[in-house]
Amino acid sequence: MGIGDEKALKILQKVHTTFGVPTVTDIHAAEEATMAAEYVDILQIPAFLCRQTDLLVAAAKTGKTINIKKGQFLSPLAMQFAADKVIEAGNKNVMLTERGTTFGYQDLVIDYRGIPEMQSFGYPVILDVTHSLQQPNQTNGVTGGMPQLIETVAK
């Protein structure tokens, strides 16, 4: 259930004010963009929603920086289309996040060739190492991972 969107966003705003660090939150529906933009610096589009035009456009129209996480089902080059939707809505503040590619049924891997491909679009690219080491939906129905590899992969 959680504490509620507005209360959570106010906590993020307080973190920004207190520590002077940029804050980010995921949005999952177009109607969440305006309220979230009142409280945080960066709106993040989750990987599974990175192709949702209405969500990308609503986020873009807030004027905030938009971080689009690459879906594990997309090629790095396909992220240009998601970025274009934000740009065409009048917002040039785009970041892209690489967070792994599906490898078989229960594994994600990083294809490092995708980073310069996405950088070629002219936007900052983030590597989300922890998500890229995920092992979704293991045989027990729980997502696992390989945290012991975080430091190695991050280098």
Regions found by a protein language model. Name each.
Residues 1-2, 104:
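Glycine-centered small-residue hotspots that permit tight backbone geometry or close packing
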Residues 2-4, 19-29, 41-54, 65-76, ...:
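Catalytic beta/alpha-barrel core
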Residues 5-12, 52, 79, 146, ...:
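Aromatic/hydrophobic pocket-lining residues that form the small-molecule binding cavity
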Residues 10, 14, 33, 53-61:
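Active-site loop-to-helix "anion-binding N-cap" substructures in soluble metabolic enzymes
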Residues 15-17, 88:
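A generic structural signal for short, solvent-exposed coil/turn residues
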Residues 57-155:
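Catalytic alpha/beta core domains of metabolic enzymes, predominantly
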Residues 36:
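Conserved structured catalytic cores and adjacent interaction surfaces
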Residues 4-7, 27-31, 87-89, 125-127:
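A broad, low-specificity signal for short, low-complexity segments enriched in glycine/proline
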